[in-house]
């Protein structure tokens, strides 16, 4: 089953958004 570009982009956003938020939170706590 081939993934469409839209599905790939959606998966990237879903994966990166929590990672980005966790990174921001960790940098805020580190200061």
From Swiss-Prot:
GO cellular component: photosystem I; plasma membrane-derived thylakoid membrane
Domain of life, source organism: Bacteria
Keyword Membrane carried by entry: yes
Main location group: membrane
Segments passing through the bilayer: 6-25
Family to which the UniProt record says this protein belongs: Belongs to the PsaM family.
Any Pfam family: PsaM
Keywords for the protein's UniProt record, in alphabetical order: Membrane, Photosynthesis, Photosystem I, Thylakoid, Transmembrane, Transmembrane helix
Alphabetized InterPro entries for the sequence: PSI_PsaM, PSI_PsaM_sf
Subcellular location: Cellular thylakoid membrane
Biological processes, Gene Ontology terms: photosynthesis
Protein's UniProt name: Photosystem I reaction center subunit XII
Membrane topology listed for this record: Single-pass membrane protein
């Amino acid at each position: 089953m081939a993934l469409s570009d839209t599905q790939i982009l959606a998966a990237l956003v879903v994966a990166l958004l929590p990672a980005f938020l966790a990174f921001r939170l960790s940098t805020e706590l580190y200061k």
